[in-house]
Amino acid sequence: MNFETVIGLEVHVELKTNSKIFSPAPAHFGAEPNTNTTVIDLGYPGVLPVLNKNVVDFAMRAALALNMEIEQETKFDRKNYFYPDNPKAYQISQFDKPIGKNGWIDIEVDGYTKRIGITRLHMEEDAGKLSHAGDHSLVDFNRQGTPLVEIVSEPDIRTPNEAYAYLEKLKSIIQYTDVSDCKMEEGSLRCDANISIRPYGQEEFGTKTELKNLNSFNYVRRGLEHEELRQADVLLSGGVIEQETRRFDEKTGKTILMRVKEGTDDYRYFPEPDLVRLSIDDAWLERVKSEIPELPDARKKRYVEELGLTPYDAGVLVISKEISDFFESMIVNGADAKLSANWLMGDVSAYLNAEQKDLKDTALTPENLAEMVKLITDGTISSKIGKKVFAELVENGGSAQEIVKAKGLVQISDEGALLAIVTEVLDNNAQSIEDFKNGKDRAIGFLVGQIMKATKGQANPPMVNKLLQQEIAKR
């Protein structure tokens, strides 16, 4: 029997407001434990929450960027549960009237485009953070009360690769709106996945399992890949899928049972009595709409139509707002668009991945990389020499022009000087000339290599090829 996988994702995004959602405490990451708290966050008796208006602005901006309808008459609700990182024994969230609903994003994966629906986006407060040491646990309440939006997809995702593409696109859009930095390593973007399988052709959903401990997009994909196989094995052996919560173990690549899943009724939602209903008038909504910047899809379209990039290259560039903004600044500084894109997608991305860094953590600037690209474009240096210049720029910064000058890296483009070297190489390699004339194309590569060796890699490659062809034809 063949099964179809059905996946829905719940993504929590911390909003980068200066203060928390219901208290004036700072909402910044990295402070000493239990220093960014107030009596409101800790649930002291008699204190009342006050809604941070910036949180509503940010939530609306994110929802609109995800093509959602804004609920202009909304409210908050209490979600009741007890856990050590939740000092009030309830969380202020939104239940039946989320601020955003009925959205969608388009993803590109495995050669096709697919629209994934988004059920809802709602505001809520984050919980504290537990850490475990030996036979006891520690709790840090700095995160308690940090503003969140939870973004819930429709069960439209059918493969782990689609889930990965959805998360990449969602993260990109949120970063472009500037409401969150979406750093998974700091917990400002977290994802839970719901997955079930059903026989192909069956309309009714199977029993779902929720996956947690998904600390990277790759772990989301791996966890889903394992879980769809596990569920298929259970059904094919005559078993029944239980509704449960499982965690992904990155060491084994398997999912492990945590607990039987609670239903919505277990949380005993009811309207938050300490907050009035929230009314969003048309003027407020229109102001937030006007603040939405150019989003990835629009920027990709502009790169293709105005800068002549291929749809693939444009799509790769716009996924990361940091990379895309850097590219834009390079263009402003006069660099060629296609060559700039090649460097950013190639050597720059390879370096960042290898070193696990962001662009801001390097000595590169749009100005110095644009200067290097212009030196390649005007023939001052070759792309090969450019790699040497790049290695210096990314570590130490400075001026590309000065590096080329100080290290004597200017490309040899003087035809007379190159002709002398070409002639000498040909005189010393008669067999290679003969091989080339007999159809062995590799021989020309050997000859080019000898010339590059003689010039320490500084010969102009197109000129070398032209002179070689001319001089071989004469012999």
UniProtKB/Swiss-Prot annotation:
Annotated keywords: ATP-binding, Ligase, Nucleotide-binding, Protein biosynthesis
Protein name per Swiss-Prot or TrEMBL: Aspartyl/glutamyl-tRNA(Asn/Gln) amidotransferase subunit B
Glycoprotein listed as a keyword: no
Known partners and oligomeric status: Heterotrimer of A, B and C subunits.
InterPro entries listed in its UniProt record: Asn/Gln-tRNA_amidoTrfase_suB/E (IPR017959), Asn/Gln-tRNA_Trfase_suB/E_cat (IPR006075), Asn/Gln_amidotransferase (IPR018027), Asn/Gln_tRNA_amidoTrase-B-like (IPR003789), GatB (IPR004413), GatB_C_1 (IPR042114), GatB_Yqey_C_2 (IPR023168), Gln-tRNA_amidoTrfase_suB_CS (IPR017958)
Record-linked NCBIfam families: gatB, PRK05477.1-1, PRK05477.1-2, PRK05477.1-4
Role noted for this protein: Allows the formation of correctly charged Asn-tRNA(Asn) or Gln-tRNA(Gln) through the transamidation of misacylated Asp-tRNA(Asn) or Glu-tRNA(Gln) in organisms which lack either or both of asparaginyl-tRNA or glutaminyl-tRNA synthetases. The reaction takes place in the presence of glutamine and ATP through an activated phospho-Asp-tRNA(Asn) or phospho-Glu-tRNA(Gln).
SMART domains: GatB_Yqey
Organism placement in taxonomy: Bacteria, Bacillati, Bacillota, Bacilli, Bacillales
Similarity-based family: Belongs to the GatB/GatE family. GatB subfamily.
